[in-house]
A protein has these predicted regions:
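Non-catalytic helical/linker scaffolds that mediate oligomerization, partner binding
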Residues: 1-110, 117-380
Length: 380
């Protein structure tokens, strides 16, 4: 892959730690050296990203299924932000700032003239263990009101909250109240561990860095990391928090990539530009934050602002998604890569295509050759 033109590798630290990746990093460095390449090693921090929990095996979700949402215990003390951010985030997370999304009147039969709601309401509240369970961070629970949408795995799976129930159980003479949340599957699919989760419209403020992020940053330099990618950047204080952690680790020379994945990042892009070494247009979660038909326009707006400021930017997500299972890309995919380069992208990156795909070498071949074709067109 290096011999074909690959310039580096990205590790997603939502699934593995740097300390666990020593063998893989060593193989990458040896392969690059054989090809005369000085490789980039980018690491994607966990940051404020929301993800589902770890499960022993994938869960098949079918349209119309009812699933139960349960919690991943949130260890608030294991998360870290800079002092000013910590106070601000705590204030924003209070219930008074929760943006409620009204339930749609005809969703699951709520309202007159629809009997489905009353039947579902009786059927939802069964004994624990009778539903497929999806784990979400508990900080999402105040937002799980009927009508709230939940998008999983970059929007491939679409749920809608239909019921919130409370069980009262007696334990040692004391009553314990347990809240349970139920959702209807609108678009099904195969859900695996640690997939992205989004609640469109909900204002959720997880901490900028987790304890795991800080541990990874501490050893980033000795592991040969050249760039840190901060997900879901909301404002420049997120980037300053990461910079502070890099300084404390003696790793100020590691480049900082700001991932634009929500509308906060889009709106505040001008303020983010001076604080980041490179902007990442991360179209997976960004495509959950806007209508998909608006995503190309948002991508172009970000590209224009980066060009005007002289700031390099990267385009990622589904560049060659069909090649996870096909040895040949679609015409639309090569067109996408071509126009990303023509719009001024300094770099492009594939993810699942090489991480879990069947044709990683062919992915790099098509990507590199398409980039070279675009560069040739630019210079014509």
């Amino acid at each position: 892959m290096f011999s074909l033109g690959m310039t580096g590798m990205r590790l997603n630290l939502s699934h593995v730690t740097l300390a666990e990746s020593g063998d893989l990093i060593g193989k990458m460095k040896r392969a690059a050296e054989k090809c005369g390449v000085k490789p980039q090693l980018l690491v994607d921090l966990q940051g404020p990203e929301l993800r589902t929990g770890t499960i022993s095996e994938p869960v098949s979700l079918k349209n119309g299924d009812i699933v139960e949402i349960c919690g991943i215990p949130e260890k608030v003390k294991d998360s870290s932000v800079s002092g000013a951010d910590r106070k601000e985030i705590a204030q924003k997370s209070e219930n008074k700032d929760i943006e409620k999304i009204p339930a749609e009147k005809n969703i699951c039969g709520k309202g007159s003239g629809n009997a489905d709601r009353s039947q579902n309401k009786r059927d939802h509240v069964k004994a624990p263990g009778e539903y497929a369970k999806i784990m979400l961070p508990e900080l999402t629970f105040p937002y799980l009101i009927p009508g709230q949408e939940v998008l999983l795995d970059d929007g491939k799976i679409h749920l809608k909250i239909v019921e919130k129930a409370e069980n009262v159980t007696e334990n040692g003479g004391e009553n314990t109240q347990e809240k349970r949340y139920f959702a209807k599957v609108l678009w099904g699919g195969l859900l695996k561990s640690r997939k992205s989760a989004a609640l469109p419209g909900a204002k959720i403020y997880p901490p900028t860095l987790t304890n795991s992020d800080l541990a990874n940053i501490k050893i980033a330099k000795e592991m040969g990391v050249t760039g840190v990618m901060q997900p879901f950047v909301r404002d420049h204080s997120d980037l300053e928090c990461v910079k502070e952690a890099l300084r404390e680790a003696g790793a100020e020379d590691i480049r900082l990539f700001a991932k634009i994945e929500n509308m906060d990042g889009v709106r505040k892009l001008e303020k983010l530009l001076p604080a980041a070494d490179e902007i990442v247009i991360a179209r997976g979660d960004l495509g959950n934050a806007v209508h998909l038909w608006d995503l190309p326009g948002v991508q172009r707006q970000i590209a224009e602002k980066c060009r005007a400021a002289g700031k390099p930017f990267m385009v990622v997500t589904q560049m060659l998604a069909s090649m996870e299972r096909s040895p040949v890309p679609t015409r639309a995919e090569v067109n996408d890569i071509f126009h990303a380069v023509m719009d001024g992208a300094a770099s492009i990156m594939v993810t699942g295509e090489t991480a879990v795909g069947d044709y990683p070498v062919e992915v790099i071949r098509y990507m590199v050759n398409t980039v070279r074709s675009a560069e040739k067109e630019e210079n014509r």
